[in-house]
Amino acid sequence: MESRREKNPMTEEESDGLIAARRIQRLSLHLSPSLTPSPSLPLVQTETCSARSKKLDVNGEALSLYMRGKHIDIQEKIFDFFNSRPDLQTPIEISKDDHRELCMNQLIGLVREAGVRPFRYVADDPEKYFAIMEAVGSVDMSLGIKMGVQYSLWGGSVINLGTKKHRDKYFDGIDNLDYTGCFAMTELHHGSNVQGLQTTATFDPLKDEFVIDTPNDGAIKWWIGNAAVHGKFATVFARLILPTHDSKGVSDMGVHAFIVPIRDMKTHQTLPGVEIQDCGHKVGLNGVDNGALRFRSVRIPRDNLLNRFGDVSRDGTYTSSLPTINKRFGATLGELVGGRVGLAYASVGVLKISATIAIRYSLLRQQFGPPKQPEVSILDYQSQQHKLMPMLASTYAYHFATVYLVEKYSEMKKTHDEQLVADVHALSAGLKSYVTSYTAKALSVCREACGGHGYAAVNRFGSLRNDHDIFQTFEGDNTVLLQQVAADLLKRYKEKFQGGTLTVTWSYLRESMNTYLSQPNPVTARWEGEDHLRDPKFQLDAFRYRTSRLLQNVAARLQKHSKTLGGFGAWNRCLNHLLTLAESHIETVILAKFIEAVKNCPDPSAKAALKLACDLYALDRIWKDIGTYRNVDYVAPNKAKAIHKLTEYLSFQVRNVAKELVDAFELPDHVTRAPIAMQSDAYSQYTQVVGF
Ligand SMILES: Cc1cc2nc3c(=O)[nH]c(=O)nc-3n(C[C@H](O)[C@H](O)[C@H](O)COP(=O)(O)OP(=O)(O)OC[C@H]3O[C@@H](n4cnc5c(N)ncnc54)[C@H](O)[C@@H]3O)c2cc1C
């Protein structure tokens, strides 16, 4: 390709001079931030070139200990196992079929050789289960998903939707991988709309069996993980049809889950009445064998109904402790939120890997610099900081938020507390959706931040991006999940006015309706001191104010439009508003958890580093939405400017401790195995990859 320099009529010297002058101009702006002196911004105001070397001395070990949590041991066991088994590491180039076999062998190795038994933790110690998932997902994301299908989806549905008889019969086989299985919910015509599923399970009282049928092509189970090659069983979601003595002859009891054997235990041949096709090569996650399932009058014993929320007796009588189809459906799906919790948590793991690679590379890579002086690290460019430092701060923010989600989920599994169930349901939907959308975008930013080298497959962004992309869709499409959060907020908003209680995560709404919705205070709207802007109270108030306003406004809009458009039409008319509300609420929860984590950090230097990151997270978000705050005069013009300047300053401060912040993730080398991310000897390792 013709280079730009070849087209330029200037001499090389002139051209270099111009570029250098432009760079110097940029750098000088960058090195001495043009902040107008303000008594309220003492630190910013005195920031000069020399202050750049003034850097927080962070106790990396203490920070790392605070971040890594209590399951370091099992994660290290997993990393050591795969490190010692090059034959189980996924090569850069691999065919779909080989990848599927390798992925199955990785799982078998993990379970039968390394002795890691994820299934034992699915119900009893979910925190440990998610730590395992994070570790195996960073070895190969296909492995993380394959493990999730086997233990969280197939195994989880058996133990969470079934009863003791199912646990007794299936637990060991699922645990040791003799009973490989699938989770067959989605159909060709219905993915997000699970209540629209058409597969039927009709009770035959004569034979005491259910008959599973795919009534039309649209009801073929589609995208089912483990179905194309390895699965022996499937949890099939189908409408339960019971014979009745009235004129209709049958009664549809709604969607229930059934265990359906799909392959012979000995020969692995597909069983009679079951047809299986391969969903083929995918954009990513090709280590997972997704398939399509069609059932033609497949008979299963009555006992195969997973009967925790609804049962059928020998004579065909239906019983349930829950009064309506909707309540039973809600309870069934409620038991499956573990998958979402796992995806949110794993997505933060992906974000850590990709931010680590991009930031290490940016510290190492040098381009341009002042004349006759060494080139500067690309992370010293304000633009690179702008791309990566708020991302690093966000990674920390999401880490603490998802750790909190996992804790709440574990508590919920133990207590079954009703309010906690509701809280975890909405929080897992919100965090899964928010974090996976963020990570998907961040992966592209990281690739671009590493220039051309970011595009080499060996440096991992391609596979991370392709494998992670679908996190936005499966276990609930993000746009659909955010609507659940919005619906929940509206429900609680309504309850609040009817004197109802609010669960923990939502409790700020109680105050917000009274405090935050009064007119913005004209005095505080003008406060622009650094102490004030870095005060968690200001930051949280700003987030809560935004959520409360969005909530109040959308509630009024829905009420107005529903008179003419009906409930469905009104919701659709306000859909974007509702999505913004849900995101705003989730950001508020994330900030609250980050502030709490900073407060609880025992080591002062680690705490100071976290505080920098937390302030950057908060102010960057406020700045990104500054129009909203300005529109209602929540911040005066000068305060908006001060927020912007402080955000840039914090970006720069976080850059100074970026190495310590990424090191604290303690990702092993073979996880961030991108050669460009190696700290020393980077380019020689990289050149070896291409054969020099
Ligand atoms: C690799 C992979 C693995 C999978 N594994 C499994 C598995 O093991 N088991 C299983 O059961 N399923 C599995 N799935 C299916 C997955 O769960 C579904 O794809 C997912 O639920 C989304 O459904 P859908 O594809 O029908 O999308 P749709 O629901 O058709 O969504 C398409 C688009 O429409 C939008 N949309 C839909 N409804 C609304 C609404 N109400 N408001 C606004 N926008 C809306 C969505 O935002 C989306 O952008 C897998 C899928 C893939 C790709």
UniProtKB/Swiss-Prot annotation:
Entry comment describing in which tissues the protein is expressed: Expressed mainly in flowers and young seedlings. Lower expression in roots, leaves and bracts.
Cofactor or coenzyme needed: FAD
Transit peptide: 1-49
Enzyme Commission designation: 1.3.3.6
rRNA-binding in keyword set: no
Catalytic residues as annotated in Swiss-Prot or TrEMBL: E475 (proton acceptor)
Domain of life: Eukaryota
Catalytic activity entry: a 2,3-saturated acyl-CoA + O2 = a (2E)-enoyl-CoA + H2O2
Chain sites annotated for binding FAD: T186, S192, G225, R365, Q384, G452, T473, D477
Main location (coarse class): other
Induction comment: Induced by dehydration and abscisic acid (ABA).
Gene Ontology molecular function: acyl-CoA oxidase activity; FAD binding; fatty acid binding
Subcellular location: Peroxisome
EC class of the enzyme, as a word: oxidoreductase
Co-factor binding comment: Binds 1 FAD per subunit.
Keywords: FAD, Fatty acid metabolism, Flavoprotein, Lipid metabolism, Oxidoreductase, Peroxisome, Transit peptide
GO terms of biological process kind: fatty acid beta-oxidation; fatty acid beta-oxidation using acyl-CoA oxidase; long-chain fatty acid metabolic process
GO cellular component, one term: peroxisome
Assembly: Homodimer.
Function per UniProt: Catalyzes the desaturation of long-chain acyl-CoAs to 2-trans-enoyl-CoAs. Active on substrates longer than C14 and mostly with C18-CoA. Activity on long-chain mono-unsaturated substrates is double than with the corresponding saturated substrates.
Family the entry assigns: Belongs to the acyl-CoA oxidase family.
Name listed for the protein in its UniProt record: Acyl-coenzyme A oxidase 2, peroxisomal
